[in-house]
Amino acid sequence: MAFVPAPGYQPTYNPTLPYHNPIPGGLRVGMSVYIQGVASEHMKRFFVNFEVGQGQGADVAFHFNPRFDGWDKVVLNSKQNGSWGQEERKMSMPFRKGAAFELVFMVMTEHFKVVVNGTPFHEFKHRIPLQMVTHLHVDGDLMLQSINFIGGQPPSNQMPMPAQAYPMPMSAQAYPSPGQYYQQQSRLPTMEGPPAFNPPVPFNGRLQGGLIVRRTIIIKGYIPPTAKSFVINFKVGSSGDVALHINPRMTEGAVVRNSFLNGSWGSEERKVSYNPFGPGQFFDLSVRCGADRFKVYANGKHLFDFSHRLSAFQRVDLVEIHGDVTLSYVQI
C-alpha cells in the first residue's frame, strides 16, 4: 500500500544520485531539509547545493561540500553569475566514512543553520534571496536514504512550521511501556501542533484535540549502536490506558506492539515484513489513525497495521517516547 505524506511533509526515499529536483513550494523561512544517508567507505567528497534553477551554470545560494582529502574540512560557498564567492571553511569533519548520518538545513531569516547528527555545525549567511532558490542538488560519495522537505507547501489553514524547537507540554505521568501511534489515511492526512526539533528523551507530547481519524504523527530519530530498546506510547492521560504501544527491541530484532487497557496488557503482535530499527540506523516513522486501525509506515514503507482495541481511541491525548533512542523531529 502506498505511503501518502501529510501536508507540509514532503519525503523522498532511497533517491538515486545525482539528486537534482525542485524544492516543493520553493524555499522559504521556516523550512527544514532533512537528508539521511551513509557516507561511502572510500568517501572523498560530496556536496549539497541550493540552486537557482536547474541549468548547468545555475547560481548556487548555498554550497555545502565535505572533503576528505588529507585535510578533512567542509567548504561552504555560493555562486553568482558564474563566479564562486568567498569560501568559508570549517576545519572539522562531522561525517565518518561508512557511517550513517543525518544532515539538516534549517532556513532562518538571516542564514542557513546546519545541524549534523543533532549537533549544530555552522551558520551560513544568505547571499542570494531565498525566494530565488528553486532546486536541491546532491551528489558525490554517499548513498542517500531519504530527503525530507518539512514545512513546504503548508495548507491554507496552517501557519508555516517554525525552524526552532518548541517545548512540548509535559505530562505528569510517564507510562513505563512502549507504544507507537499510527494513523490510517482515508482521504487527506492532517498534522496539528508545532514541531519539536531535536527534543529530549523522554519525550511527552500532548495531542491537542485528541486522536482523530486521518491524523498523522511523524517521528524521526536515530538508534544508538548500543541501544537495547525504546518505547512509543499513545496514551489516555486520565486513565493510563495505552491504545498503541510500540516497542522496538534491538536485542531481539523484534518490533513488539500491544495495548494496555483497564490495567492489563493485551496480546502481543510481532509480525513485520522488515525491521527498520537497527543499531546505528536512522528511522522515519509516520503514524496514521484510521476509523478501525492504526497504519504505521517506516522510511516510506508499510510496516504494520494495528486494529483499534480501545474503541474510544479519540480519548488518546498523549504521545510518550522513552528508552534508547535519539529524536531529531517530532510532529504531533
Swiss-Prot record:
Gene3D superfamilies: 2.60.120.200. The keyword Magnesium does not apply. GO terms for molecular function: carbohydrate binding. PROSITE patterns: GALECTIN (PS51304). Residues 19-150, 203-332 form the Galectin domain. The modification Phosphoserine is found at residue 267. The keyword Isomerase does not apply. SMART domains: Gal-bind_lectin, GLECT. A beta-D-galactoside binds at residues 265-271. It comes from the Eukaryota. Keywords: Lectin, Phosphoprotein, Repeat. InterPro entries: ConA-like_dom_sf, Galectin-like, Galectin_CRD. Contains two homologous but distinct carbohydrate-binding domains. Monomer. Galectin that binds lactose and a related range of sugars. May be involved in the assembly of adherens junctions. This is Galectin-4. It comes from Bos taurus. The gene is LGALS4.
